[in-house]
Amino acid sequence: MKNTILILFTAFIALLGFFGMSAEALADPKADPLAGPNPDADPEAINLKAIAALVKKLLG
């Protein structure tokens, strides 16, 4: 049961990261992808990305 919950949680975090990056790309399609995130493009997408990174860091 614990492994199932861990797998589902990891999949959820991965989807958050994927859709967060997609939303950021849609909000600012002409931005240089190597320049990093644009804080003016879509702050909510950047926050989801930051939350996903924090959870990944906490889980190891």
Curated annotation (Swiss-Prot):
Distribution of this protein across tissues and organs: Expressed by the venom gland.
Known role: The synthetic peptide shows antimicrobial activities against Gram-negative bacteria (but not against all strains tested), Gram-positive bacteria (all strains tested) and the fungi C.albicans and C.parapsilosis. Exhibits little hemolytic activity against washed human erythrocytes.
UniProt repeat feature AXPX, residue ranges: 27-30, 31-34, 35-38, 41-44
Propeptide section residues: 28-45
Organism: Vespa tropica
Protein name: Mastoparan-VT6
Keywords associated with the record: Amidation, Antibiotic, Antimicrobial, Fungicide, Immunity, Innate immunity, Repeat, Secreted, Signal
Leucine amide found at: 59
Cellular-component GO terms for this entry: extracellular region
Signal peptide (residue range): 1-27
A GO biological process held by the record: defense response to fungus
Subcellular location, record wording: Secreted
Family label: Belongs to the MCD family. Mastoparan subfamily.
Coiled coil, from the record: none
